[in-house]
Amino acid sequence: MFLQNISKFISNYRYEQATVESLTTVKAAFLDFFGVTYRGMSEEAPSIALNTIEEILPKRNSNLTASIIGQNFKTDILSAAFVNGIAAHVLELDDGHRGAQLHLGAVIFSTALAISEAYDLTGREFLEGVIVGYEVGILLGQLVNPKHRNKGFHTTGTIGTFIAGVVASKLLKLDEKQTLNALGLCGTQAAGLLESDHGGSMGKVLHVGKASYNGILSAFLARNGFTGSGTIFDGDEGFLKTMVLDNTNHDIDEFSFENVLKNIGKVRVRDIYFKKYPFCRHLHSSIDTALKLKASIGDEYNHIQNVAVKTYEIAAEHNNFHPKNLEELKQSLPYAVAISLVVGEVSVDKINQLIEFGLLENYSTVDDVNAIKNIVNGMIILSDDKLNELYPSKRPSNVIIKLDDVFRNGIFQNITFLPKGDFENPLQLRELIDKFKGLNPHYDIKNLTVIDSLEDYNMKYVVRKLKG
């Protein structure tokens, strides 16, 4: 059975098997997760989630053992993972994997931190769970996509539930049989529809919180003897046939289980990407390209007559020309490009400022906002067949701007094949620290040094140190 082999790997994996490169990457990912989540906790969605949890569980006492990042109190493991997961994803700045087409760190660290602090696990145990989560998560995501995503499922919610179950099972030291039961329970709870994304709701960030919650719940249930189906992934009415394949009559053997199992434990965690801009990852190549053009035209954006964006199909589908709220704005390719061309800065603070100045309203007195709207009105988004052929190994975008007669109707264009933050076009550690500082200017950055030596500490100490 497929999941039985996965469970064996999870149960047997040890810290000593990790490469230096993997350890370096996951420590950088932990730093990034903490910075994004610390800032994200001030957003509306995690605040609502936290208030809801307190409404259901209105007690704070010494028996509550897991921290909510950025808060000065503790709660239970499930609630902490749930709220931290939402906060980790709400800014659209959390890490992911290009081929697996999902966000990993938001689920993995929300799960691992809650359990590791509550049980005061060692840094080595914490890292074991984190690396196993990345390894299995990347493999499962690559196995089911792009078909799974193309059917309308948000892989971060669906496969993310399995990932959380993997991490929780490892940290709770479940044996192979218990881990298999936990993954079986994860599969029957795996959920997440991309309509939440397109609808401009908070549902998309709920997927991360619920993935962490359900994965942890599954592992605890399995530890206590609750059983789950060992064929939930590849069975006749399992995950693949109901949520991935176009036709349930397809032969399940088209999936290369042998290759997946052969590669388990060999996936390079280094292949994850880190995000620079608070927009959907599919928009980042277009943002990078627009910023290159901004460097060429400077402040002459009022002379832009029209803009054409040629990109791959999934990116082109993010063609919302009239976003009504922040959630919709983060998925709007026209606005992402226009903001880049006008202000040359794509940060959380800048986006919030533009919204305050009327970016999402029908009228504004601010010149930059009106310039952005004018560019959006003169923009076309095109799905390009040749660029689409390069996806998903590349995420290309070609942005073309035509200037007015003051510039002799000149045409500027540029193309990006892989956005900033991918392994082949990486964000360096100093850039991740700059990202952290930009999000959290009042945080004492010296607290982060504990992450460099996680192996030397227990996780309760690590959390206290990060709290400052």
Language-model segments: which ranges?
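Terminal-appendage/accessory-domain detector
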Residues: 1-101, 203-213, 220-468
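Short connector loops/turns at beta-strand edges and beta->alpha or beta->beta junctions
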Residues: 88, 107-109, 114, 136, ...
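Well-ordered alpha-helical segments within folded domains of soluble proteins
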Residues: 106-113, 160-166, 213-217, 283-285, ...
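Glycine-rich, mobile lid/loop segments that gate access to catalytic sites or pores
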Residues: 117-216, 231-236
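Hydrophobic face of alpha-helices
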Residues: 23, 27, 31, 108, ...
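Short helix-coil transition sites and intra-membrane helix breaks within transmembrane domains
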Residues: 98-105, 153-158, 276
